[in-house]
Amino acid sequence: MRTESELRKHPVQEARFFREGRGEADVLKILIVEDDAQLATTLKYLVEDNPRYLVVATADDLDGAVAAADQHAPHLALVDLQLARGSTGFSVAVRLGDFDVPCLFVSGKAPAFPMPDLALGCLMKPFTAEDVHRSLAMAEDLMRGRETLRPRQPPNLTLYDTVIGGEVDMQPGFIPSRRSLKTRLEHWIAGHQH
């Protein structure tokens, strides 16, 4: 069992799996939010290449993602940052947070700064089947609160929990979200207490 401070680090993910009685061997239900239909189909195929992962729905915008999360209760969402009908992956991640669904961004252009409040990390396009498999395994380890036993992180995957404690290179003019500011302040205070 994890300590209280460890649970605070990833409370949504930890609670979601064990509150519902899921064990280590259960299937991870995944929602794909991608507006390129061909890429969504390819990603679905790559994800389901591993029998431990099941794509329960695909969506191409915010409304579709919210409806799919409400209907299918996925454990993880793979979310593109630029979506159909003016939606963004950021807005999808915020709304999926209301359903306790953690996100892994999948994008051709990564955010210029880490967003641990919104996503576990970002897998950059283009990617290989091996990149997808390793990224899902590492995301699952984070969500289940396991130590990562996979030493080789794909070069195009950035996990935000590994950046939180360190210095973050902010772009000039960037203003983080209120939740992000609160999280960063809490980490700064925790790091400066003796």
Segments predicted by a language model, with ranges:
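CheY-like receiver
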Residues: 8, 15-18, 134, 141-194
